[in-house]
A protein has these predicted regions:
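Basic, flexible linker segments flanking DNA-binding modules
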Residues: 1-91, 172, 181-182, 195-200, ...
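C-terminal domain-tail junction helix/linker
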Residues: 59, 67-68, 186-188, 209-268
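Two-metal-ion RNase H-like nuclease active-site motif
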Residues: 66-78, 95-111
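RNase H-like polynucleotidyl transferase catalytic core
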Residues: 165-170, 184-203, 219-224
Length: 268
């Protein structure tokens, strides 16, 4: 039987160095099979199970039914200059497009460099079903975030979902009295993540990566307007056609079903 001292050393190296069983075995002079058995017993046999910040095993959770908790956040994307940006073109071509766009809009920074601006994407996702709602806005002020929340709550209500709680980070909009009052008016309990622990809101952070790969950076856009126009179609694909591993390879929309005939609420 493996001693407690050896087990602690194995776990310590796993947390600090994020090494595999063979590498840990080489460092500590124990069989790789023993290392693997210890990692499995401690539920850290996969690196994806370990929090990158704390080194502790991830504590995953899912609320029991739609609306029990929604996650909200804001992610930002640089606007696209007329003709496209440097991500798909050369840097020089992208720079010329920025110059032309700034000349048309008159938007320049204090040092006269072209300023294209930022799109603030307000996102809302249901914890249980992963059903997603999003709006592109020009800022992340409290009044804007509250407007998005109201419309998202109404959107979910149209699909038979009553929102009970909302989880956000500690951004200025979400810690404001206005946000608290709006939640009270909507009969929603506001909750916030622990400071410096964005992984607490990990579901929506993961959604942002999916959204970036599937929509924002998926193809060449000639302008910000063209990218914005593509968002509703991508959201429909995400909600209705993209299988989700955490949902047993079902879709978010299929998870939101009525008790009658097992028909998705979205299509009634």
């Amino acid at each position: 039987k493996t001693s407690q001292q050896v087990m602690r050393r194995i776990v310590d190296v796993r947390w600090r160095k994020r090494l595999g069983p063979v590498q840990i075995a080489g460092r500590l002079g124990v069989p790789a099979s023993t290392v693997h058995a210890v990692l499995t017993r401690c539920r850290i046999n996969r690196l994806s199970y370990i929090d990158r910040v704390t080194g502790e095993p991830l504590r995953r959770y899912e609320h029991d039914y739609p609306g029990s908790l929604i996650h909200v956040d804001v992610t930002k994307f640089a606007n696209i200059p007329d003709g496209g940006g440097h991500r798909f073109l050369s840097r020089e071509h992208g720079r010329r497009n920025r110059q032309r766009t700034a000349h048309r809009t008159g938007e320049r920074a204090g040092n006269w460099r072209p300023r294209i601006g930022i799109a603030f994407l307000h996102t809302v996702i249901d914890d249980h079903s992963r059903m997603a709602y999003a709006e592109i806005q020009s800022d992340e002020k409290a009044v804007t975030a509250i407007g998005v929340l109201r419309r998202a709550v109404a959107w979910f209500a149209e699909r038979g979902v009553t929102v009970e709680r909302v989880l956000s980070d500690n951004g200025s909009a979400y810690v404001s009295y206005a946000w608290r009052d709006a939640c009270a008016e909507l009969n929603i309990t506001p909750k916030r993540t622990r400071p410096y622990r964005p992984q607490t809101n990990g579901k929506i952070e993961r959604f942002h990566r999916t959204l970036g790969d599937g929509w924002a950076y998926a193809r060449f856009y000639e302008s910000t307007d063209q990218r914005n126009t593509a968002l509703p179609g991508w959201l429909h694909f995400y909600n209705h056609h993209r299988a989700h591993g955490a949902l047993g390879w079902s879709t978010p929309a299929a998870t939101l079903t009525t008790l009658r005939d097992n028909v998705p609420v979205e299509h009634i």
